[in-house]
């Protein structure tokens, strides 16, 4: 069954939204990661050829204490890339809204409930953190590499084409980034805007061709997580780096932003540095 068919049958995407009035964990819609990975010719009977996570920031998160007083926080959810499923975004939004009128003893009780529900849906332990005070919010992050967007290019390809990628014989270690990433929701067609950062060691990637490849996603319809995995696999296969990390930070929609990270390095650390567009 295709990802689109699963979503059309089960998701609230593209439908009139009815917001829950009480805690409703069954709203969460898990989507098998294998559905997309098969299209990338990834052997789904083995562990994926990368490590990483999907980091979600939730900006519209609230609940009641036992006296009925509302509390608010920013939520941070870290779902391992090795989990069997991802969570469909609108179902996640509705699930979080189901906490709005629910009473809890404290923030820890809320986060523990969310951790239990999410971990059950994706079949792996999910990390849940709450940012409760302004002093905990990180400052905007600027990548330390080369910005590709300053390059003057001509392009008329707006669907992913890995054949655009090319390398030279020189071996380098460098970080490249772009704010021109755009793809689209595969169900609603809504645009997904983001920034992408690529760090690698290997044959030097032609910068102009890499920018063209990034822009080629402009009319592509695929989820955030799937786009980043497609980036990773295309660069890995066509450019053959010894080390590779690809991460994207998408702008928010419906009070959520999604930030997938994929790497050949198994000893990565989770970094939640918000971009200036977030």
UniProtKB/Swiss-Prot annotation:
Gene3D superfamilies hit by this protein: 3.30.1130.10
Subcellular location: Cytoplasm
GO biological process: queuosine biosynthetic process; tRNA modification
Biased composition (Polar residues): 261-278
Keywords: Cytoplasm, NADP, Oxidoreductase, Queuosine biosynthesis
Function (record text): Catalyzes the NADPH-dependent reduction of 7-cyano-7-deazaguanine (preQ0) to 7-aminomethyl-7-deazaguanine (preQ1).
Region of interest (Disordered), residue spans: 255-278
An example Gene Ontology molecular-function term: preQ1 synthase activity
HAMAP family in alphabetical order: QueF_type2
Catalytic reaction annotation: 7-aminomethyl-7-carbaguanine + 2 NADP(+) = 7-cyano-7-deazaguanine + 2 NADPH + 3 H(+)
Amino acids binding substrate: 87-89, 224-225
Entry protein name: NADPH-dependent 7-cyano-7-deazaguanine reductase
Main location: cytoplasm
Keyword Cytoplasm: yes
EC number, UniProt record: 1.7.1.13
Subunit structure of this chain's protein: Homodimer.
UniProt entry tagged with the keyword Ribosomal protein: no
Metabolic or biological pathway: tRNA modification; tRNA-queuosine biosynthesis
Residues that hold NADPH according to the record: 89-90, 253-254
EC supergroup of this enzyme: oxidoreductase
